[in-house]
Swiss-Prot record:
General function of this protein: This protein is located at the 30S-50S ribosomal subunit interface and may play a role in the structure and function of the aminoacyl-tRNA binding site.
Any one GO molecular function term: structural constituent of ribosome
Protein species of origin: Treponema pallidum (strain Nichols)
Name of protein: Large ribosomal subunit protein bL19
GO annotation terms (biological process): translation
Gene transcribed to yield this protein: rplS
Keyword annotations of the record: Ribonucleoprotein, Ribosomal protein
Covalent S-S links between cysteines: none
Length: 123
């Protein structure tokens, strides 16, 4: 009984991302920041290291290098604060978690590009 209620509430809170992305993709996350009374949108661009959990609790970790220091940020996938997620570059990886990238430096931290086929317009 209570499981059904929880699932109903979670389904109401679920938000489908406009563009799907995978682990290994370089993404730009646009999210809202509230500073006092003002609200602005900030972009955070980096490599998707992993997805965790499922349902409404699903999160993804994005890693970027900022002035030579690796910075990671965890975003809830269905958060109302996330405006949109744009895929900058599709990556080809064979792992679900890319934690090994943390130890890599420079060219060793590169990810191969994945060729994405776009649907052709039907005339």
């Amino acid at each position: 009984m209570s499981c059904h209620l929880i699932q109903q509430i979670e389904n109401q809170q679920r938000k489908e991302p406009a563009e799907t992305f995978r682990v290994g993709d370089t993404v730009r996350v646009h999210f809202k920041i509230v500073e006092g009374k003002t609200e602005r949108i900030q972009a955070y661009e980096g490599l998707v290291l992993c997805f965790k959990n499922s349902g409404v609790r699903r999160t993804f970790t994005v890693r970027k290098n900022s002035y030579g220091v690796g910075v990671e940020r965890i975003f809830p996938l269905h958060s109302p604060r996330i405006e949109r997620v744009d895929v900058v570059r599709a990556g080809k990886v064979r792992r679900a978690k890319l934690y090994y990238i943390r130890e890599k430096i420079g060219k060793a931290a590169r990810i191969k590009a994945r060729i994405v086929k776009k649907p052709s317009p039907s005339a």
